[in-house]
A protein has these predicted regions:
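Structural recognition of the beta-strand scaffold that forms the well-ordered cores
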Residues: 17-20, 85-90, 123-125, 148-152, ...
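A short linear-motif detector with a strong N-terminal bias
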Residues: 53-54, 65-67, 128-130, 153-156, ...
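A long, amphipathic alpha-helix that forms part
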Residues: 62, 66-79, 106-147, 164
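Flexible glycine/proline-enriched surface loops and loop-helix/loop-strand junctions
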Residues: 50-56, 112-117, 151, 173-177
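Substrate-binding rim/cap in mid-to-C-terminal beta-strand-loop elements of soluble/periplasmic
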Residues: 26-32, 37-49, 132-141, 166-180
């Protein structure tokens, strides 16, 4: 739902748990060091500041990893109480800003990518790792054959307009001629 309406709160849509979800379509920062877009005293710097991940503030935990860790905790809780679960996992990746996920950044720089392209690649790899971690949890806990996974996105490859991309473009949106 839109900002400042009841629909912006996932609890109003029937969700029992909300981890870092809000009405903004993106985020202010992927970086725990930047408190995901909050000042040190907890004030949001913009409507895009990510709520609900305060325990990761000031750490090197990229928001993609923080969301994955929290999702796994929710799955662990459902498993502990032998409850069925519905996990709606909505990553912020690969939305702008193009913050670098340092877990993967050097790998792409060594391949000769520009800073922008390497940062973009780290967002994709971080999301891939997140999905892999969730799939591993399902396998380890005997839930893989009893779980339906639907993977979708509202984003195409990042647009090629000046300022968004540089160097060789590693994504394309054919037959469309721009992004999203």
């Amino acid at each position: 739902g839109a900002i400042d309406t009841p629909g912006e709160d996932p609890h109003h849509w029937g969700f029992e748990v909300n981890i870092a979800g809000h009405a903004a379509g993106g985020l202010a920062s992927y970086l725990g060091e930047e408190n995901y877009g909050h000042t040190k005293d907890g004030k949001a710097v913009s409507l895009m500041s990510v709520p609900g991940l305060e325990k990761y503030w000031g750490t090197e935990t990229f928001v993609t990893e923080a969301l994955t860790l929290e999702a796994i905790k929710a799955l662990d809780k459902a498993k502990k109480y032998n409850q069925p679960f519905y996990l709606y996992m909505s990553q912020y990746a690969i939305h702008i800003p193009l913050n670098k996920d340092m877990r993967f950044y050097e790998k792409y720089k060594k391949k000769g990518m520009t800073d922008h392209e390497a940062a973009y690649a780290t967002l994709i790899e971080g999301m891939d790792k997140s999905l892999g971690d969730l799939m591993n949890w399902l396998e380890k806990n005997g839930e893989a054959n009893n779980t339906i996974i639907i993977f979708m996105s509202d984003n195409g490859g990042l647009a090629s307009e000046s300022g968004w991309r540089d160097g060789k473009l590693h994504t394309q949106n054919y037959p469309l001629n721009s992004g999203k």
